[in-house]
Structure formats: structure tokens, C-alpha cells
Regions:
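Short alpha-helical segments that sit at the start of domains
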Residues: 1-22, 47-50, 54
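Short capping segments at the starts of secondary-structure elements
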Residues: 25-35
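The DNA-recognition helices of helix-turn-helix-type DNA-binding domains
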Residues: 29, 43, 55
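Short helix-coil junctions and helix-kink-helix linkers
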Residues: 34-46
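A short, conserved structural fragment
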Residues: 56-67
Length: 67
């Protein structure tokens, strides 16, 4: 299971609206991608997954694995 936690970022001006919404959802703590998307009503699943992966690649959020 992979959960994501938010990281400090200075990329606010270049984030999309969806990325900001995802980053704000993670203020409560690490969540799985499906839980993040569930907390964003009306959001397209595939668009949100793309944004989550893009944010992880950019370092805005950090993947945490349960090993």
C-alpha cells in the first residue's frame, strides 16, 4: 500500500488548481491515492491520478510504502 504525504513546496504559482486541492487534502496526514480522490468530489479519477503522480515526481508529495 502506498500512501502520500505532503512536503514543503515553493511551486504554488505553477501548480494547477487540482494539484492545490490534492495538496490541501493531505493536511490531515498521509493518505492512499484512492482516499485522496474520494475527498475531491466531482474530480475525474484518471486526471487526479495523473496529478498525484506528477506531484510525487516534482517532490510536492512523498510516497510512503508500508514494508
Amino acid at each position: 500500500m502506498i500512501r502520500y504525504s505532503r512536503q514543503p513546496t515553493d511551486r504554488w504559482l505553477s501548480m494547477t488548481r487540482l494539484e492545490v486541492r490534492i495538496w490541501n487534502v493531505l493536511h490531515e496526514g498521509p493518505l492512499e491515492a484512492s482516499e485522496i480522490i474520494r475527498r475531491l468530489p466531482g474530480t475525474d479519477y484518471f486526471e487526479a491520478m495523473d496529478a498525484i503522480h506528477r506531484m510525487a515526481k516534482m517532490g510536492d508529495i512523498k510516497p510512503i510504502t508500508d514494508d
